[in-house]
Amino acid sequence: YEVGAAMAPYSSVSRLFRRHPSIRWSRPYHSMIDDSVRTLLDAEPQWRIADCSEPAILHDGYRPELLAGSDKADRLRQAMEADLQERPGDPYASAKLGGLLISEGKNEDAIPLLENGLKQCGSAGAERYELLLHLGLALTPSDPDKAVNCYRQALEIPLDTRVSLGARLNLAARLMDQGNL
């Protein structure tokens, strides 16, 4: 659970794991172990992934008072821009940088970045959900109907209900604005 997070209070992250020499951190800035776990499961299929039904970690690094005056946004921007230089259109980096741009009010910069990330993203999964959620947020001021479509597509992805809370709440808000709820 992301205490104080403005956009999505729940995230599904792989942070609790059994010690194994093949599991390592990857990706810039928002480190994760998912890539190495996929490789490990291919090589050693006897391993199983456990899913916590309740939030296992309370993270408070996104509270506004903690972010104010920090260089967290600059570090995120630099890491994601460098990653996109190496892998243009990478869905993970596009989603993270797109979210940052939206939080800074740069929706017009975020939209093409997120659309490009979606073109290179598979048909399911957390990255696609995050791209669609952020694209919906970016489109809301200029094209609320298109934003509604993004939220609906995001909700078609089979994710834990808590993880999809952002799309659910934003879809409900847009439908209320349109008088359709």
PLM features: residue spans?
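Catalytic-site signature of metal-activated, phosphate-bearing donor transferases
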Residues: 1-105, 109-112
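Alpha-helical junction/boundary sensor with strong preference for TPR arrays
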Residues: 2, 87, 121, 157-158
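Start-of-helix register in tetratricopeptide repeats
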Residues: 92, 126-130, 163-166
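Structural motif corresponding to the intra-repeat A-B loop/turn of tetratricopeptide repeats
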Residues: 104, 141-142, 178
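Alpha-helical positions within canonical tetratricopeptide repeat
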Residues: 109, 146-149
